[in-house]
Amino acid sequence: MDKSEKRFERDIESFLISPAGGYTQFCGQDAEGNWVHTRQHDVSKCIYMDVLCEFIAKTQPKEWTRYTKYYGVQAVDKLYHRLEKAISNQGLLYVLRNGIEDMGCKLKVCFFKPESDLNPVTVERYEANILGCTRQFRYSTA
């Protein structure tokens, strides 16, 4: 009898990536059974920057164009450092609610469910949120 939490973990993941859960699976198993990321997970930063940039570009194209025009090839790295600083200084909930601002660009990192569906733009932005599911990571300080 398996006394580990693997079955429990698998059940949670199965629900989250089902149509009812609404999440996208960010990792899967290869032919040898090893877990591999389907998105670009940055281990040192512990974030999927490609997913965040995709979300911002899709939901806030004008701001993202301005941001990338200003920073050029460094845009993704600058975004990460600004995000990290904002979370450290103001807290994660503040950043989720208010987004970040850098060089005059206001960038939201998520959109909350609108009170009503009268404004189709707010509904569209809410539905554009990218919720990802990744199996737990092995952590080591060694």
Where are these regions (language model features)?
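An alpha-helical interface "stripe"
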Residues: 1-142
